[in-house]
Amino acid sequence: MTALTSAAIVGGGLAGCECARKLARAGIAVTLFEMKPHSFSPAHSSPELGELVCSNSLRSDEPEAGVGVLKQEMRALGSLVMEVAEATRVPAGKALAVDRGLFAASMTAAMEAEPGITLIRREITSLDDPALQGFDAVVIAAGPVASESLSRSLADAVGATHLYFYDAIAPIISADSVNMEKAFWGSRYRPEDTDYLNCPMNREEYFAFREALVEGEKAATKDFEKELHFEGCMPIEALAERGEMTLAFGPFKPVGLDDPRTGRRPFAVVQLRTENLNKTMFNLVGCQTKLKYGEQDRIFRMIPGLEDAEFVRYGSVHRNTYVNAPQVLNGDQSLKNRPDVFLAGQITGVEGYVESAANGMWLGMMLAARKHGENIPQPPVECALGALAAHLRTPVKKFQPSNINFGLTPELNQRARKKDRKALYAERARENFTQWYALLPASARS
């Protein structure tokens, strides 16, 4: 095992920034390459690092949710993303939502201020780019929409064809364009909350909207790409095509959202989530889409209260690129045929911002240990971080990206009612993580 003194990281997203700080604080000289603002992916528009596409991208903060458990583990391990998220948090019920602009600006400031990190605004187009020569390790953390040239280089290196699916982004509208005579505030079973704005639908309005979604014109995909949808990012029109009531029993379910004007539960409810601290923008919850922009104007304005909606950002679709991790990556996330090149974040096959950040942090911990010739034991599969790591190591017939969920962990060794199982999984995860954490060298705990 060769000690590391220098590393290049390609990509200033959550995974790249997490990895960079871990390495820098271990005394490793880090050069962080970010192609923005000279070049942008289809999913990004800000020159800042750590750009999120949605204020609620960090998802649930409940201690018994899989992603909530992962966040707890990340906080214990000194996660940069968790620190910045807490500092830029906005009210969102049980979710960890942030002011996206403040979050990205804070991530950028953290990288620029960290001793040992040199930020270079330059696009890396190949694993053999001259700018990457001379480093002890190269980390590719270019995200799910890596540039075509870098993706081709990576495909050549792993010797396998990339797999593609589409992440669909929900529209954002201006708050002052919402008709408040039709919308009402409240979270499920918590009518006093002002984290969500709700647009109630009657039966006729729901079915007319659902029909418009099904018939709406969608953005075209490239001929050479096969379209696959990850369940967690299913476009709303794809859900609508599954059945007449799929939306009403899914993202538009009215449970716990009685209309205070009528005292009755609507047939369906479209929720709007605040996008920033000032509540000047709202995200249409569950309305991620690949409808053409003109169709978004027409169809989403069919929602009661949104007849005059002003779109701050339209929904869109972007490619997600990832490798078949069990086949092409070693346990330390290095390429099997290029052991000096490591992958981090969503390109490995973890799915989601929190998961990508955790993966980058974990890679940073493993590489930082090499500075002192140490080994860090793999986290137990019963905890969230270990379950994600095991997902990338476990050979399967058809490898697909995965969020953190308790289904990635072993079955419970006891019988339990369905409503109690999450709590038991979460408690087991905490116990196993605590035992593993005690084995870590002090340098790996911060």
UniProtKB/Swiss-Prot annotation:
The cellular location(s) given in this protein's UniProt record come to:
Cytoplasm
Superkingdom as given in the UniProt entry = Bacteria
What are its cofactors? FAD
The top EC class, named as a word, is: transferase
> What's in the keyword line of the UniProt record?
Cytoplasm, FAD, Flavoprotein, Methyltransferase, NAD, NADP, Transferase, tRNA processing
Binding positions for FAD per the UniProt entry: G11, G12, G13, L14, A15, G16
Q: What is this protein called?
A: Methylenetetrahydrofolate--tRNA-(uracil-5-)-methyltransferase TrmFO
- Taxonomic placement: Bacteria, Pseudomonadati, Thermodesulfobacteriota, Desulfovibrionia, Desulfovibrionales
The gene behind this protein is trmFO
